[in-house]
Regions:
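Catalytic-core regions of glycoside hydrolase
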Residues: 1-51, 55-181
Protein backbone atom coordinates (compact mmCIF):
# COMPACT_ATOMS: atom_id res chain seq x y z
CA UNK A 1 0.00 0.00 0.00
CA UNK A 2 1.16 3.49 -0.82
CA UNK A 3 1.40 5.71 2.27
CA UNK A 4 0.63 9.34 1.57
CA UNK A 5 1.02 12.00 4.25
CA UNK A 6 -1.39 14.88 4.68
CA UNK A 7 0.22 17.98 3.22
CA UNK A 8 -0.87 21.39 2.05
CA UNK A 9 -0.56 23.16 -1.29
CA UNK A 10 -1.77 26.76 -1.28
CA UNK A 11 -3.51 28.59 -4.13
CA UNK A 12 -4.22 25.29 -5.85
CA UNK A 13 -5.14 24.07 -8.32
CA UNK A 14 -3.77 26.44 -10.95
CA UNK A 15 -5.59 25.39 -14.09
CA UNK A 16 -4.60 28.51 -16.04
CA UNK A 17 -1.52 26.69 -17.32
CA UNK A 18 -3.64 23.99 -18.96
CA UNK A 19 -4.55 25.44 -22.37
CA UNK A 20 -7.04 22.65 -23.01
CA UNK A 21 -9.02 23.76 -19.95
CA UNK A 22 -8.79 27.47 -20.72
CA UNK A 23 -10.11 26.83 -24.24
CA UNK A 24 -12.25 23.73 -23.73
CA UNK A 25 -13.79 24.34 -20.32
CA UNK A 26 -13.95 28.12 -19.84
CA UNK A 27 -16.84 27.72 -17.40
CA UNK A 28 -14.46 26.41 -14.70
CA UNK A 29 -12.89 29.88 -14.50
CA UNK A 30 -14.27 32.94 -12.76
CA UNK A 31 -16.48 35.14 -14.92
CA UNK A 32 -15.76 38.85 -14.87
CA UNK A 33 -18.57 41.44 -14.88
CA UNK A 34 -18.05 41.91 -18.63
CA UNK A 35 -18.64 38.18 -19.29
CA UNK A 36 -15.02 37.25 -20.04
CA UNK A 37 -13.28 34.52 -18.07
CA UNK A 38 -10.35 34.97 -15.69
CA UNK A 39 -8.21 31.81 -16.00
CA UNK A 40 -6.16 32.57 -12.90
CA UNK A 41 -9.23 32.13 -10.67
CA UNK A 42 -11.61 29.17 -10.55
CA UNK A 43 -15.39 29.44 -10.58
CA UNK A 44 -16.47 27.48 -7.49
CA UNK A 45 -20.17 27.62 -8.33
CA UNK A 46 -20.20 25.88 -11.71
CA UNK A 47 -20.80 22.08 -11.59
CA UNK A 48 -18.07 21.58 -14.23
CA UNK A 49 -15.46 22.80 -11.72
CA UNK A 50 -16.38 20.03 -9.29
CA UNK A 51 -16.38 17.54 -12.16
CA UNK A 52 -12.88 18.68 -13.21
CA UNK A 53 -11.58 18.48 -9.63
CA UNK A 54 -12.90 14.93 -9.36
CA UNK A 55 -11.38 14.03 -12.74
CA UNK A 56 -8.00 15.19 -11.46
CA UNK A 57 -8.35 13.19 -8.25
CA UNK A 58 -9.37 10.12 -10.25
CA UNK A 59 -6.25 10.54 -12.42
CA UNK A 60 -4.02 10.82 -9.35
CA UNK A 61 -5.55 7.78 -7.63
CA UNK A 62 -5.29 5.70 -10.82
CA UNK A 63 -1.64 6.65 -11.22
CA UNK A 64 -2.32 8.51 -14.46
CA UNK A 65 -0.44 11.60 -13.40
CA UNK A 66 -1.57 14.63 -11.50
CA UNK A 67 -3.20 16.48 -14.37
CA UNK A 68 -5.78 18.89 -12.89
CA UNK A 69 -5.33 17.25 -9.50
CA UNK A 70 -4.97 19.33 -6.35
CA UNK A 71 -3.74 16.15 -4.59
CA UNK A 72 -0.69 16.16 -2.36
CA UNK A 73 -0.20 12.99 -0.37
CA UNK A 74 -3.50 12.28 1.38
CA UNK A 75 -4.63 15.87 0.95
CA UNK A 76 -6.90 17.56 -1.55
CA UNK A 77 -6.57 21.31 -1.32
CA UNK A 78 -9.21 23.95 -1.92
CA UNK A 79 -7.23 27.19 -1.79
CA UNK A 80 -8.37 29.78 -4.33
CA UNK A 81 -5.99 32.22 -5.99
CA UNK A 82 -4.67 35.07 -3.84
CA UNK A 83 -7.48 37.48 -4.81
CA UNK A 84 -11.01 38.16 -3.63
CA UNK A 85 -13.50 35.99 -5.46
CA UNK A 86 -15.91 37.90 -7.69
CA UNK A 87 -17.53 35.51 -10.13
CA UNK A 88 -20.53 36.84 -12.03
CA UNK A 89 -21.78 33.53 -13.44
CA UNK A 90 -25.36 32.43 -12.78
CA UNK A 91 -24.23 29.65 -10.41
CA UNK A 92 -22.15 31.91 -8.17
CA UNK A 93 -24.75 34.69 -8.18
CA UNK A 94 -27.28 32.27 -6.64
CA UNK A 95 -24.91 31.54 -3.75
CA UNK A 96 -23.47 35.04 -3.30
CA UNK A 97 -24.23 36.70 0.05
CA UNK A 98 -24.83 40.37 -0.66
CA UNK A 99 -25.02 40.96 3.10
CA UNK A 100 -21.84 38.96 3.82
CA UNK A 101 -19.61 42.00 4.15
CA UNK A 102 -15.93 42.07 3.35
CA UNK A 103 -15.28 38.62 4.81
CA UNK A 104 -18.39 36.72 3.76
CA UNK A 105 -19.68 37.66 0.31
CA UNK A 106 -18.24 34.55 -1.36
CA UNK A 107 -18.28 32.25 1.69
CA UNK A 108 -21.31 30.21 0.66
CA UNK A 109 -19.97 29.80 -2.89
CA UNK A 110 -16.72 28.19 -1.76
CA UNK A 111 -18.10 26.38 1.30
CA UNK A 112 -20.82 24.72 -0.80
CA UNK A 113 -18.14 23.59 -3.25
CA UNK A 114 -15.95 22.19 -0.44
CA UNK A 115 -18.96 20.38 1.05
CA UNK A 116 -19.88 18.74 -2.28
CA UNK A 117 -16.26 17.87 -3.05
CA UNK A 118 -15.63 16.30 0.36
CA UNK A 119 -18.79 14.20 0.21
CA UNK A 120 -17.96 12.95 -3.30
CA UNK A 121 -14.36 12.18 -2.35
CA UNK A 122 -15.51 10.21 0.70
CA UNK A 123 -18.08 8.31 -1.40
CA UNK A 124 -15.78 7.54 -4.36
CA UNK A 125 -12.50 6.86 -2.56
CA UNK A 126 -13.28 5.68 0.98
CA UNK A 127 -10.14 3.53 1.19
CA UNK A 128 -7.87 6.46 0.32
CA UNK A 129 -8.94 8.38 3.45
CA UNK A 130 -8.33 11.73 1.80
CA UNK A 131 -8.54 14.95 3.80
CA UNK A 132 -9.97 17.96 1.98
CA UNK A 133 -8.06 20.96 3.27
CA UNK A 134 -9.98 24.20 2.92
CA UNK A 135 -8.30 27.57 3.40
CA UNK A 136 -10.95 30.30 3.88
CA UNK A 137 -9.43 33.69 3.11
CA UNK A 138 -10.39 37.24 2.08
CA UNK A 139 -14.08 37.48 1.14
CA UNK A 140 -14.85 33.81 1.88
CA UNK A 141 -13.58 33.78 5.48
CA UNK A 142 -16.87 34.05 7.40
CA UNK A 143 -18.50 30.67 8.01
CA UNK A 144 -21.87 30.59 6.21
CA UNK A 145 -24.99 29.38 7.98
CA UNK A 146 -26.37 25.96 7.14
CA UNK A 147 -23.23 24.18 5.94
CA UNK A 148 -21.84 21.36 8.08
CA UNK A 149 -18.78 19.80 6.52
CA UNK A 150 -18.27 16.04 6.66
CA UNK A 151 -15.48 14.64 8.82
CA UNK A 152 -12.94 14.52 5.99
CA UNK A 153 -12.68 18.35 5.83
CA UNK A 154 -9.94 20.24 7.65
CA UNK A 155 -10.50 24.00 7.76
CA UNK A 156 -7.39 26.15 8.11
CA UNK A 157 -8.86 29.58 8.66
CA UNK A 158 -6.91 32.73 7.89
CA UNK A 159 -7.90 35.37 10.43
CA UNK A 160 -8.29 38.41 8.23
CA UNK A 161 -7.98 41.22 10.82
CA UNK A 162 -4.38 40.14 11.44
CA UNK A 163 -2.96 38.51 14.55
CA UNK A 164 -2.01 41.78 16.25
CA UNK A 165 -5.65 42.93 16.13
CA UNK A 166 -6.80 39.96 18.22
CA UNK A 167 -5.86 41.88 21.36
CA UNK A 168 -8.96 44.02 20.72
CA UNK A 169 -11.92 42.38 22.54
CA UNK A 170 -14.47 43.00 19.76
CA UNK A 171 -12.21 41.49 17.10
CA UNK A 172 -11.26 38.55 19.30
CA UNK A 173 -14.95 37.84 20.03
CA UNK A 174 -15.95 38.13 16.38
CA UNK A 175 -13.19 35.77 15.24
CA UNK A 176 -13.97 33.28 18.01
CA UNK A 177 -17.64 33.19 16.97
CA UNK A 178 -16.58 32.48 13.40
CA UNK A 179 -14.34 29.63 14.57
CA UNK A 180 -17.15 28.09 16.59
CA UNK A 181 -19.54 28.01 13.63
Amino acid sequence: AVVRPVSLAVHQPDWSRHAELVKGRPEVFQMRADGTRQPEVLCYGHPKTLETYLEGIRNAVAGNGKKYAPVSGKSITVSPADVELACYCEHCKKLWDKDGGQYGGASRVVAAFVDKLAREVKRRWPKEKFTVIYLPYLNYTAAPDGIKFPGNVEVQLCGMPGLAAYKEPAIRESEQKNLER
